[in-house]
């Protein structure tokens, strides 16, 4: 008598590209707890390896990856279903906009070659008349990723409210330490903040949308 062995469902594999940053640091453990197979990539492998003391990070495949070094992208993307793109080049100085576009083009090309099913990109909210080079670059980076053949879902988030968020902690320190402050005009600008926990929920859920769904 023959019997059919039970089918084994292999969980999807996600690459968190930019895993040493604020969002990546929080997203990796969340994906592991959701049952995903996770690979974390950053320019500095040592930074990621230092997290092995945390049992959650021991379940993560760690690799070095730099979108400005295309030769590192193939190994990082091999066998990946969903790739989270969380990097930028602001630390490079005045040329960061050009480098952001170059990095995005390299990543989109390598993701297509590796057979990645979807790229999830975390962008920023961009006002209609934006004069921030950083925000404009974030928008153009998403556009460049979409020029590739791999479907892209972009989440545009404002100030992220949570422990470790640079923008949030600057505001908190100002409020706690300065009873009176003369403020510049830009503090009157309206913004739509988002809690870190909510953003992580969205990042996980959009990766599970049907292939035909996507966009910004």
Q: Model-found features: residue ranges?
A:
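NAD(P)H-binding glycine-rich loop region in Rossmannoid oxidoreductase-like domains
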Residues: 46, 50, 54-114, 124-130
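Substrate-positioning beta->alpha
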Residues: 103, 166-167, 186-208, 214-215
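Structural motif
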Residues: 13, 81-82, 118
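Mid/C-terminal beta-alpha module of Rossmann-like enzyme folds, strongest
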Residues: 2-13, 202-216
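Conserved glycine-rich Rossmann-like NAD(P)H-binding loop of the short-chain dehydrogenase/reductase
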Residues: 36-43
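The conserved SAM/SAH-binding core of class I Rossmann-like methyltransferase domains
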Residues: 41, 86, 155
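N-terminal Rossmann NAD(P)H-binding glycine-rich loop of SDR-like oxidoreductase domains
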Residues: 6-36
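Glycine-/Pro-rich loop/turn segments that contact NAD(P) or position catalytic residues
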Residues: 89-177
């Amino acid at each position: 008598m023959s019997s059919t062995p039970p089918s084994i469902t292999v969980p999807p594999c996600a690459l968190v590209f930019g895993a040493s940053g604020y969002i990546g640091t929080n997203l990796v453990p969340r994906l592991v707890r959701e049952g995903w197979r996770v690979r974390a990539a950053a320019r500095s492998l040592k930074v990621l390896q230092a997290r092995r003391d945390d049992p959650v990070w021991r379940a993560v495949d760690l690799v070095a990856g730099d979108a400005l070094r295309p030769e590192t992208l193939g190994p990082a993307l091999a066998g990946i279903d969903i790739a989270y793109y969380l990097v930028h080049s602001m630390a490079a100085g005045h040329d960061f906009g050009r480098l952001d576009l170059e990095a995005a083009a390299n990543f989109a090309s390598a993701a297509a070659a590796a057979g990645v099913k979807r790229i999830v990109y975390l962008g920023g909210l961009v006002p209609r008349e934006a004069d921030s080079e950083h925000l404009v670059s974030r928008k153009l980076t998403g556009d460049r990723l979409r020029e590739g053949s791999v479907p892209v879902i972009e989440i545009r988030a404002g100030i992220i409210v949570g422990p470790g968020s640079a923008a949030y902690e600057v505001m908190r320190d100002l409020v706690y330490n300065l009873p009176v402050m003369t403020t510049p005009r830009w503090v009157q600008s309206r913004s739509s903040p988002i809690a870190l926990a909510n953003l992580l929920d969205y990042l996980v859920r959009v990766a599970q949308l049907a292939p035909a769904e996507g966009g910004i």
